[in-house]
Amino acid sequence: DLEPNLKPFYDGGVIYDYARHARNPKKILIKLFENFTLKGGKFLKLNIEKLDFDEEKPVIRSETQRFIFDKLVIACGAFSKKFTDKLHENIPLETERGYHVHFKGYENLISRPIVYADKGFGMTPMEQGLRVVGTVEFGGLENPLSKSRISNLVLNAREMLDGLPEHNDEWLGFRPTLPDFLPIIGPSKNFKNVFYSFGHHHLGWTLGAISGKIISSMISDENTNLDLEPYSSLRFS
């Protein structure tokens, strides 16, 4: 068997020979961030109090600082709607919440990501341990984590693998979701110097670099050679 630790609960499966996964996505993002700063990029973490304009140039204000830009990109994932609402653009962005648990020290029970399609969850060996993920709910940004969904993940994992202890940590992630399952990539309909890149659902990490390249080309008035109309915010006008 490819995965000898799995219980014999299945009749068969599908293997994706060329599928890949990252055992620690955060490490990759840190390396990308380091490269960004080495090339002159600057990072500031601030609470944004206001977004307005000075002769069509976007202006961001915190409690103590004011920044004016030639062009501004809103790429805040599920939190992007807080800014698009301020720009009077009615974008139906929803928060699709997915749940995760870790079993630290049990990552060697499987050698690759495994999805149990009938139960709607999956398991992945990570540096932090065996990660079990699944379930989807439209729960907004403020509602608390659902303990029943965590319990279901743990029970489902134990249906597949023997000897799992109590899990070490649990959390949920926010996926920015739009009704047509396409992201928004392109300029604001109301303000020509504001651009959007959000709404990538479950594929933000996968498509982030591609979207960044597209937005960079648009801001620089370069030809992308792509039909971006399906990704325009105008589709929700």
Predicted regions and their residues:
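Dinucleotide-binding Rossmann-like beta1-alpha1 core, especially the glycine-rich loop
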Residues: 1
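Alpha-helical scaffold segments in soluble metabolic enzymes
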Residues: 31, 38, 82, 156, ...
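Surface-exposed helix-capping loop/turn segments at secondary-structure junctions
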Residues: 38-42, 89, 161-166, 223-225
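Active-site substrate-recognition segment that forms the wall
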Residues: 53, 57, 66-193
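C-terminal lid/capping helical subdomain adjacent to the catalytic/cofactor pocket in oxidative enzymes
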Residues: 184, 189-237
